[in-house]
Design a protein with these regions (language model features):
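Intrinsically disordered, low-complexity non-transmembrane regions of multi-pass membrane transporters
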Residues: 1-30, 234-248, 282-299
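Flexible hinge motifs at transmembrane-helix junctions and intramembrane kinks/re-entrant loops
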Residues: 2-4, 53-62, 182, 186, ...
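N-terminal signal-anchor module of multipass membrane proteins
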Residues: 2-90, 101-113
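Short juxtamembrane and helix-loop transition motifs at transmembrane-helix boundaries
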Residues: 22-30, 50-60, 78-87, 110-123, ...
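Short, non-helical or kinked segments that cap or interrupt transmembrane helices
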Residues: 58-63, 84-99, 147-155, 210-215, ...
């Protein structure tokens, strides 16, 4: 069946720029910035959690830089498509929260036997390096599993992912997990301001307002939060000017006992990735059945594998296809794969120059929650449709 004959999803996303369109530079960089702002926290949070819980605070700034650096490289691979590797879609790469518990378990296992920082990290990255190849095997059977990857199955997965993300967004709107002022009126007011700004701007027919709705909403929220005294620029950490990527900086170790739980998650994560890629295809007005669709899923999983291997090599946690940016595509109407190149470049810069990322980390949780709630809501709606 040719691409032209492949059925398209009956889903209206009202795109300004389609998958193969090339937006002019200003539109592309503006759209890319919104994807980065929407996904930045999700990319670095697993690293912050793992580093904090395992007591690796001294290495966290470097690990965060590498998470952003590898996310940029992985996003480029996924969108650019190198032979059979890469879906060719505007898909960001980041670490799934499902990996956190098993990685923490591996870290505590090494710590219990007296292992230091280097041994903990070398073991984590070593087992993730080998476990990533499981996705290569699974990707080869995607064609045979097409009867299982039905619209009902993928739609259910997408909806559940959207609902789980909505929970995160609502928590952020209230002030963030563990906040002393959780649910305070000031937090909810900031979140409502950002959310309403994005919704109102999306009602205009002006492409610029729609394209910039997320950046405008976040900027307005950040400025108001600063005016309210909720942004402390003095809290910026003292970081090196440049973080240099060093392959296997902490060494390379392996542990069978720690490997098995991580391998199990790698067996499950392709199903989540298939849902993310399906949602992206729907919103990008691409087929969600037929040979082209199956090949995209297969190639996307291969890219996830390569990116996870690359992540372990450059001292970062496993990389998978992110669901967060699907909502950005729908809100902005920009599905162009070429925008992914700009996203990749911005993420690499954030990784190499950690001070930029540190400034973005000052974004108050309610401001971010107001923007992500509407984006994650569109992911859930895509699954229902």
């Amino acid at each position: 069946m040719s691409d032209a004959q492949t059925p398209r999803p009956r889903y209206k996303s009202d795109l300004i720029y389609g998958l193969d369109d090339r937006p002019h530079f200003s539109a592309a960089i503006f759209a890319a910035l919104q994807h980065v702002l929407a996904s930045f926290v999700g990319i670095i949070t697993p690293t912050l959690i793992v580093g904090g819980v395992l007591g690796l605070e001294s290495e966290v700034p470097y690990l965060v830089s590498m998470a952003l650096f590898v996310s940029g490289l992985g996003t480029f691979v996924q969108a650019r498509k190198f032979g059979p590797v890469g879906s060719g879609l505007l898909c960001l790469q980041g670490t799934s929260f499902s990996f956190i518990s098993v990685i923490l378990s591996a870290g505590f296992m090494v710590k219990a036997r007296g292992g230091g920082t280097d041994e903990i990290l070398s073991t984590i990255f070593g087992i993730c390096f080998f476990a990533a190849f499981i996705e290569v095997v699974l990707s080869q059977f995607i064609g045979k599993l097409r009867k299982l990857i039905t619209p009902v199955v993928t739609g259910t997965i997408i909806t559940l992912m959207g609902l789980s993300l909505i929970k995160v967004a609502v928590t952020d709107m209230a002030g963030g997990y563990g906040a002393s002022d959780l649910g305070a009126a000031g937090n909810m007011g900031l979140a409502a301001l950002v959310l309403l700004t994005i919704v109102v701007l999306n009602r205009f027919n002006n492409p610029f307002l729609r394209l910039g709705s997320i950046v405008i909403g976040l900027t307005l929220g950040f400025v108001v939060a600063w005016w309210m005294g909720r942004v402390d620029l003095a809290a910026l950490p003292h970081l090196p000017l440049i973080s240099v990527p060093v392959p296997f900086k902490y060494g390379f170790s392996f542990d069978w006992v720690a490997f098995i739980p991580v391998a199990v998650i790698f067996l499950i994560s392709p199903l989540e990735a298939a849902g993310d890629l399906t949602a992206n295809s729907m919103i990008s007005q691409q087929p969600v059945k037929g040979p082209l669709y199956i090949n995209r899923i297969k190639s996307g999983l291969l890219a996830d594998c390569l990116n996870s291997v690359m992540a372990a090599t450059f001292n970062s946690l496993p990389m998978v296809t992110f669901a967060q940016n699907n909502g950005v595509i729908q809100l902005t109407g920009v599905a162009s794969r070429y925008v992914a190149y700009f996203i990749a470049g911005l993420l690499v810069l954030l990784g190499l120059f950690p001070m930029i990322g540190a400034v973005l980390q000052l974004m108050p949780k309610p401001v971010l929650g107001g923007a992500t709630l509407i984006m994650f809501g569109t992911v859930a709606v895509a699954g229902i449709k």
